[in-house]
UniProtKB/Swiss-Prot annotation:
Glycans are attached at residues 122, 141, 156. The gene is CarT. The chain crosses the membrane at residues 54-74, 179-199, 207-227, 237-257, 265-285, 294-314, 386-406, 415-435, 442-462, 470-490, 501-521, 528-548. It is found in: Cell membrane; Cell projection, Axon. Pfam families: Sugar_tr. This is Carcinine transporter. GO terms for cellular component: axon terminus; plasma membrane. Residues 75-178, 228-236, 286-293, 407-414, 463-469, 522-527 are extracellular.
Amino acid sequence: MSDIEDNDGDEYDELSELRQRHKPESQPSVDEAFDLDDLLPTIGEFGKYQKLLVFGICLPACIPCGFCAFNQLFMADTPDDYWCRIPELLDLPLEQRKSLSIPKELDNDELVYSKCYTYGVNWTQLLESGEEDDLTTMEPNASWPLIKCPQGWEYNTSVVWSSIVIDFDLVCDQDIYPTIGLAALNTGGPVGVYLFGLLNDRGGRRLSYFVCLATLLAGSLMTSLSKDFWTWAGSRVIVGLTIPAVYQIPFIISLELVGENYRSFVTVMTCTFYTSGIMLLSGVTYLERDWVRLSYITSLPFYAYFLYMFVMPESPRWLLMRGRLEEALKILERMAKVNGREFPEAVHLKLEAQIRRDKLKKQKKKMANVGLADLCRTPNMRLKTILITLSWFANETVYLGLSYYGPALGTNQYVSFFLSAVVELPSYLCCWYFMDTWGRRWPLSLSMILGGVACVITVMLPDDAVDETLVLYLVSKALLSASFLIIYPFAGELYPTQVRGIGIGASSYIGGLGLIGIPFITYLGKDNLKLPLVIMGFLSMLGGMTGLRLPETLHHRLPQTIEEGEEFGKNWQFKDCCRCAQKPEILSQPASYENLDVLAGSSTNASEVELELRDSRRVREPAPRIDERTPLDTTASGSGRPVHRPSMKRLVRQMSVMDTQRTHDGTMQLTHWI
């Protein structure tokens, strides 16, 4: 029965091909695959237009994005010393006031003034019954009862001048409230990613970005005007809705308009500028320690980004997806003009064919009805989905937890926070190199395991080893930053094209749940400074070990269907996790869509350009069995000739609207999956 179906399919394909041959030349076939990546080598992959876009819009927009994510650490800073406020004794000198009204308690084998208790006596009556000279020599009576601070606290403001902790008295029984506020910020993230993702797809990149800016500024303004904790926490949820959308949207626009050979550069530069913004935040918070003014200052740059309304282009890919051909052509023609290139006239017909084909694809996708359940339907896909999600959860949770915990270490919180950002920069560059030489699995697992070990061994240091603890923390932060950059492309390569968006979305959402819980882990450091590091260290090592079981993707053809995804890595053996990826010998360049040198030639004939843009006719070949050891380029059995995969063009483009940079053998290189 299956043979009959195969024969019918072959006859149908031959008939379809025959019809396509006899179509008029002026009517492009719906089957003709066209992508902007075909056109960019002709009109400029990274010309003047893209440079203005990246360096004038994308990268400047990334700098203050860390402000709204981490300024809360300093807005909710707790002074080192505080004690019960006794209004009746405010006229007395500080030391006399504390010695009379505050009991002492044992802390680390040292007697210190209590932070949460005072003597429960009638101070007004006591003052009226005594003489002024008696007050200077009066000592607390051991029989006086102890009560919790009934009228608030006084604070030592020598380091922390102003914070919500001081204004709202969030200490003692309410000292967990700043942690709740941090969890509220992270709660908004997954919701915002979903909402702005919908707006991004339906309303366009420009509209989504400016709505995101307006939402962030509204939340920041509410933050500054808050008069109680719960209003402040609610405003942080609104700010959290825009994290990380406010960072991702201009990044997406840039990636969609630059050529494939420059997307890795844009990705690394984006991460670098984002980290530079975090470094800048440490200086801003050092100079401005009033939390209300800090909220205003850190939101101020986002007002300037509304000027982008006059210069930020809409994504041509999104316009084509929505069938808005003329608007897309106008942007592409302007890009070619600014780059000093000629725009091929034949592209207009190709774009019309692309729009018709995309509509057919959407109809077929609706009929296919692939969902989240397909990730767990077969055993190998189910195992890989679980492992990817666990590794993602551990990676994202520990990375953010370490970022939050930096100010708590060392002798100066501003210096510690600055150093925690500085160590990310070299880790990105090292990660970029090792990903494309050692593969994805080993750099990911090794960085997470070693980073976890660096956290755990802090428990072996004495309590007074402040500098040594900080050094181990910085080593761990650098390693986790590298792994944080790897997990996105690795997951994107492991999930089959058919369910890639669903898989990445599911893993990132589950990983986002860890961001809500990690503030409560760092809260444990109030009683034991090293306990959060130990917990995050074990979680990081667990995530790194789960990554070893995943199949390597470097130099392997990526799975497209769920069936191929089930086969990929199915024959995994223990020895596979003990070796790095080996680069296969490339006998010749494959016939893939990356070989677009002809488009960059000097041909000016429109018909020639149209032929150059047209796909080569695909030849039906039996689908090979795909497993972890299947290289991208194979040779014909016994012939020694390379068997090219003419379908590579369609294979790669189905992966994402942000196609990943590849080497000449088609291997995916570093990118940031959204």
